[in-house]
C-alpha cells in the first residue's frame, strides 16, 4: 500500500458530536501511517450526510476528479452519506477515477496482514 495517496474524510451529524471528528481523524491517520499510506488531505465536517453539496464532499470530489488521490479513508460507510443511493453514486465516481474507498475496518484488517 506504500506510495498511495489518500484523502481522510471525517463527518458527524451534529455539533454535539463534533469531538468525534478528532477521534476519526486520529484513528484513520494512525492506520494509514502503519500501512505507509500518504494522507494528502483531511476534511472534518458537521453535516447531515444527505447531499453532495457539503464543503467536505466538494473538496473530496475535486481530489478524485483531478486524480490527486488513490484512496478515500472513512470511519464507516455512513460517514459519506446516510442514503444508499448517494453512496452508490459516489462509488461510481470513485470507480470511474480508480479511487478505492476504505473503512476503518478495512484498514484494521490490512494492518493485521502486514
Regions found by a protein language model. Give the residues of each.
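Short, structured surface patches at the beginning of a domain
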Residues: 1-114
